[in-house]
Swiss-Prot record:
Name under which the protein is recorded: Phosphoglucosamine mutase
Active site feature: S101
GO cellular component terms attached to this protein's record: cytosol
Organism, as annotated: Streptococcus thermophilus (strain CNRZ 1066)
Family membership noted in the UniProt record: Belongs to the phosphohexose mutase family.
Post-translational modification: Activated by phosphorylation.
Annotated PANTHER family: PHOSPHOGLUCOMUTASE (ALPHA-D-GLUCOSE-1,6-BISPHOSPHATE-DEPENDENT) (PTHR42946:SF1), PHOSPHOHEXOSE MUTASE (PTHR42946)
Cofactor(s) needed by this chain: Mg(2+)
Top-rank taxon: Bacteria
Cofactor note: Binds 1 Mg(2+) ion per subunit.
Binding site for Mg(2+): S101, D240, D242, D244
InterPro entries: A-D-PHexomutase_a/b/a-I, A-D-PHexomutase_a/b/a-I/II/III, A-D-PHexomutase_a/b/a-II, A-D-PHexomutase_a/b/a-III, A-D-PHexomutase_C, A-D-PHexomutase_C_sf, A-D-PHexomutase_CS, Alpha-D-phosphohexomutase_SF
Leading EC class: isomerase
Length: 450
């Protein structure tokens, strides 16, 4: 991570931290960096989610791109993975998504994709940051024919929708409940599932610029759970603001999280001989029950740090085609290069059709262990050294011995705050409370600030 770019681009409160002035500079400097690494005039796709600040930041960003001669294709409201798909398939130099994903409406973000559809690499981001930190903007200022051109490209949305439909199966009137989070999937999710011959019930499809992720979507699935029960739907599908993640709901109204979704799709691919190296890439936060279910099926695991960025890195490095996070980011590399909630939803319904099983039957193969997470405030300098404290190392070792393999402890530093996170999983709530509270008490006594 750099000074401006985090693990998911540049984020901040719109018009406060992430200002139009900064958006202009990101467009101008980002466009210039792109132009230095290819011949000819770069072609860049730009899209946004439904936040009220989206058009403001889009206008500034586009102005910056045009000021250095970039050919800009404006996609309007589109899911983040839609940008990734179009960049790859339409030979663009790069893509830019304006979104803060599952964050509330007051936030926004700007994320760059390279011409390969993957998030821009660290080296390119560092070049942009160096220009942002320069004392003076000394970049060329072309005029007349040297300026960039702007093309409105709303047909990009339909191209992305058509692609998604080709990855699925006719659902034969299956009842599907959708929650589009009042975000980027507000139009596309409806279109896609109608094209797949589903009978749909929809919430979260009335964005007003302020209601994105507000009580709806993958981080607030309660309304979708109720809708599934009321409508008698076979499945509920909740996306987030930019539709790069999915949380599902079974026909009984119970949550099917990213771990279970990955297991269901992974087992299906494994049985067909289509799971690359018979391996699923996951993070340290995936539930122990997920790991045990994979072991039972003979499916391998590759485990990374928290963050879809690290999952994708591992997939690219070793040629894996399925990975993701408990939070609902699922990457299916055979189809797209980033987490894609709508694509994942389609693959989940495909498994239901081909197996003839309900979602609850498929999900029941994974027994999720109760999990508890406690954040403890510590000095920033100590959060990476906690395991060097003898008393902390000793209590963790003692608790792990008591678990005897039927539980899991994870103590890790926050990547962004002066916090130490203590997490445990165990067969019962009482056990998990005991393990976490015991470790947390020792951590607080040794290095805690509260």
């Amino acid at each position: 991570m750099g000074k401006y770019f985090g693990t998911d681009g540049v984020r901040g409160e719109a018009n406060v931290g992430l200002t139009p002035e900064l958006a202009f500079k990101l467009g101008r400097f980002g466009g210039y960096v792109l132009s230095q690494h290819e011949t000819g005039r770069p072609k860049v796709f730009v899209a946004r989610d439904t936040r009220i600040s989206g058009e403001m930041l889009e206008s500034a960003l586009v102005a910056g791109l045009l000021s250095v001669g970039i050919e800009v294709y404006k996609l309007g409201v589109l899911a983040t993975p839609g940008v990734s798909y179009l960049v790859r398939t339409e030979n663009a130099s790069a893509g830019v998504m304006i979104s803060a994903s599952h964050n509330p409406a007051l936030d926004n973000g700007i994320k760059f994709f390279g011409g390969d559809g993957f998030k821009l690499d660290d080296a390119r981001e560092a070049e942009i940051e160096a220009l942002l930190d320069a004392a003076e903007d000394t970049l060329p200022r072309p005029s007349a024919e040297g300026l960039g051109t702007l093309v409105d490209y709303p047909e990009g949305l339909r191209k992305y929708e058509k692609f998604l439909v080709t990855t699925g199966l006719d659902l034969g009137g299956m009842k599907v409940a959708l929650d589009a989070a009042n975000g980027a999937a507000a139009v596309s999710a409806r279109n896609i599932f109608l094209d797949l011959n589903a009978e749909i019930a929809v919430i979260g499809d009335q964005p007003d610029g302020l209601n994105i992720n507000a009580g709806v979507g993958s981080t607030h699935p309660e309304q979708l759970q109720a809708l599934v029960r009321e409508s008698g739907s076979a499945i509920g599908l909740a996306f987030d603001g930019d539709s790069d993640r999915l949380i599902a709901v079974d026909e009984n109204g119970d949550i099917v999280d990213g771990d279970k979704v990955m297991y269901i799709i992974g087992k299906y691919l494994s049985q067909k001989g289509e799971l690359a190296k018979n391996t699923i890439v996951t993070t340290v936060m995936s539930n122990l029950g997920f790991h045990k279910a994979l072991d039972r099926e003979g499916i391998n695991k590759a485990v990374t740090a928290v963050g879809d960025r690290y999952v994708v890195e591992e997939m690219r490095k070793n040629g894996y085609n399925l990975g993701g996070e408990q939070s609902g980011h699922v990457i299916i590399m055979d189809y797209n290069t980033t987490g894609d909630g709508q694509l994942t939803a389609i693959q989940l319904t495909k498994v239901m059709v081909e197996t003839g099983k309900s979602l609850s039957e498929l999900a029941a193969e994974v027994t999720i262990y109760p999990q508890k997470l406690v954040n403890i405030r510590v000095e920033n300098s100590m959060k990476d050294k906690a395991m060097d404290v003898p008393a902390i190392a000793a209590i963790i070792e003692k608790m792990e011995a008591e678990m005897a393999g039927n539980g899991r402890i994870l103590v890790r530093p926050s990547g962004t705050e002066p916090l130490l996170r203590v997490m445990a999983e165990a067969p019962t709530d009482d056990e998990v409370n005991y393990y976490v509270d015991t470790i947390a008490d020792v951590v607080r006594a040794e290095i805690g600030l509260d």
